[in-house]
Amino acid sequence: MSTGWYRSAAALLAAMGLAVLASCSYIPFVGKKSEGQPAAPACPIAVILRPLANTAVFRPGTGAEIRPIDVMFYGIYSDISASCQVNGATLRVSLDNVIAAERGPAAQGNDVDLTYFVSLTASDQTVLGKKSFGVRVSIPDRAKRGGVNDHVEVVFPTAGRPIADLNITAGFQESPQAIQFYKNYRGR
C-alpha cells in the first residue's frame, strides 16, 4: 500500500473525529448547555449563625455574676445539611444537624438538654418561619465530649418568594444567662 492511502485515511479519520467533537454540544448532558436561564436551586442555603453556634448551661442557683467556673456544659452546633421539596408556596425541609456537648468545670452527670432553632428567612432578613427543637446529648463516662446527629423535618411557607431569595438559618436558642455570659467571656 502506498503512503498516499495512509495519508487519505488519516485525514478522513481526523475529519470524522472533529465532527464527533463538534456534535457534543448537541448531546444532552455533554458539551455546551442551553443558553436559557440557569436551573433554580433545589434548596436554600443552610447556615449556622456563628454568634449562636455556641451555648452554655450553668449550674442551678448560679447568681447574677456568671463565671466560666459555673458552666456545667457547653453546646456546639457544628454542622447542618438540608434537602428540600417545594410544593407551591410551601417548602418541606429535611435537616441533619450535628450538635456536640462538652463538659464544663461544674459538670454533673453525662446528659445535657439543648434547644436549637431552624428558621426560613428572606434576603431582606424577613423571618418567614421558625421552629425550635430540643435535643439530648449524652457524653460517655470519662469522655470530655459527646455528640448527636439530630434529624428533623420542617415545613415553612415561602410567601411566594423564589428559592434563590431564601435562606435556612439555625442556631442555639440562648438563655438570658448564656447571652450575659458570652457578653463577658469570649470564646467557647
Predicted regions span which residues?
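Bacterial N-terminal signal peptides that target proteins for export
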Residues: 2-13
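C-terminal motif of bacterial Sec signal peptides marking the signal peptidase cleavage site
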Residues: 19-23
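Bacterial signal peptide processing site
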Residues: 25-28
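Post-signal peptide N-terminal segment of mature Sec-exported envelope proteins
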Residues: 33-58
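Helix-rich interaction surfaces within compact, conserved domain-sized segments
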Residues: 40, 128-188
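Transition segment at domain starts
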Residues: 50-86
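Mid-length scaffold segments of soluble, non-membrane domains
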Residues: 79, 83-129
